[in-house]
Amino acid sequence: MRSCTSFSDEPMTGWMAAAVVTLMIRMCFSVYTMLSESCQRMVIVGYGRCFADRQNLMVCLRSMPNVFTGSCARMRCCLSENLLYRHRNGHIQAEWP
């Protein structure tokens, strides 16, 4: 049985394997960067908090009065291009003026 080869008949060395893994990581990172830059306000909303790949992209809107009782804060999420409120019981469709 032949060992793993790359474009030639020479067996893949440890250095070549590391180079291939590094290239794959760079390609995945460039795709991730492209997707994250396509929506500058993309956040993932869950467990009552909002997360973003960078802190300055986090969009927790607290400027409007809270219509819910308690400490539930309004958040806007661009993940599915829908405006959502985050409530203790989950997502509630927002109706913005």
Curated annotation (Swiss-Prot):
Protein name per UniProt: Insertion element IS2 uncharacterized 11.1 kDa protein
Top-level lineage group: Bacteria
Keywords, ordered alphabetically: Transposable element
